[in-house]
Amino acid sequence: MLADTPDVDGPARKARFQPEERSDEGVLDDGSVGLPVARMGLEHEFFLVDRSGEPRDLADQFLRECWEAARAEGLDPRCFKAESVMGMVEITTPPTYSVGEMTAHYLDNLGLALGVAAELGLALYPLGAYPLPLRPVIREDPGYAVRASIIGQDRFLHAGRCAGAHLHLELPAGTVWPDVKAALCAPVTAQRELLGLYNLATALDPALVALSRTCPFYQGSTDGFAARTVHYRGILGFEGLYMGMHEVGGLSAYASRVEDLVDQQSSRYTAWFAAMDRAGVERRLFAQAGGNLHRASWNPVRLSHHGTVEIRTMDANFPEMVLAICALIRAAAERVRRERLEVRPGRGVLALEPDGDLLHVPTFSYVNGELLCAAVTSGLLDRRVEAYVDSVVRFASPYLERSELVAPLGTSGNYKNTESEILATIPHRGASLTRDQGLSLVREACCRMDEQVYSLLRRYGGVPPGDQHDPGVARVVYIRESPIILAEGMQPAGADEEQATAREADKALA
């Protein structure tokens, strides 16, 4: 059962990944090692626009209609959420056990939202930035008011100009407490999985930036950078949302032990309180607005109160690109989990390099420096970035659940992203957009969004019976009186067998 818990980023409510629903790992009767099925969840932020492409601050009316329609259709109303500004909404999935199940829930919810929008004369603009000048209206909420006062009213508006897609990967039970503290007392195997997934997500950051780039225009102009990334993180000299506040808005370093995550959280809190003091905001206001460790973290990779590692790197995008990138991330994460790989940074490493029980990754200074800079400038056209994406795809491929979903990303030597497709459609483009060009871009994106959703619904809509997890029919193997729930039809495989299969695939793909 899903617990109805507050969304610490705002007034919306979310379903928590309940730790008691995931069992610990154990040794099976044949000596092989089984793992419980780790869940995932997806969040996609959208701009509300009218049929001409103009932004509309009608989130509350739209959400009321979505909630009513969801109840009528047997969908979860909690999957339709408010955001920090009145012209943006978030559509999510409940916790799901497979890419197929997540895809079906995502598409069903998008289909409902598109129908509601059409009835209201609205559309959902799906990309990471609105292309024309936009001054969003901040939602009246104590949490947002405090945050805007700390960051600055004008800078906080970037939060309403940037839309993202976030993927949650479930962590072992007991590794992250509800107040988002990393648990030092968790079992060693659980801590290792936590560190592996967190470090993998950190290493993936520049590849995900490059693959997910969408709208090249921000406030009516383009400068060749990944617009949402530089304006949200406030990097490379841009006066963005978290400029000068790397601890709370930038990519954090790898963690070699759980204590490192605790130290990062402490530094984040300290930096946030220092920013409050500089802004003259009383600390009691933060506490009164429900302040906790989660409310002081908007990093691209963070531990979530849902008991997940949340990957927030990606631009909001067309559904097929969102699903493609999520399928790629899930496959990489499953390989780390099932092979129990230690993700270890090393000097001279420029790509993901599996080696026995290790996954070698570049140093953090390279990932968050040279490689990230390349990802937000030349992007996929940069040879370093392309080689890095190659290594990510090669590493993840053996564990892809639905290989057809990643086809929109292209292949080695011809990777694709939405940004390059948009730029190719704009004739005689300069550094700025005319208003007509911008509105046309928005309308075309909304139209493409609709077409993709209904096309994908025909293929994947409705939770497939084979993917819908029902504990009542799942096969349960009892190990020392502790149940391990395996996906229906899944045979428990030993770690050695999985490693051998993946390594053979690596050789074939090399």
Regions found by a protein language model. Name each.
Residues 121, 209, 337-341:
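Secondary-structure transition/hinge residues
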Residues 77-165:
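Well-ordered mid-protein domain cores that form the structural environment of catalytic cofactors
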Residues 2-104, 112, 116, 158, ...:
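C-terminal accessory/tail domains of diverse enzymes
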Residues 125-135, 142-165, 169, 174-264:
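Metal-dependent DNA replication initiation modules
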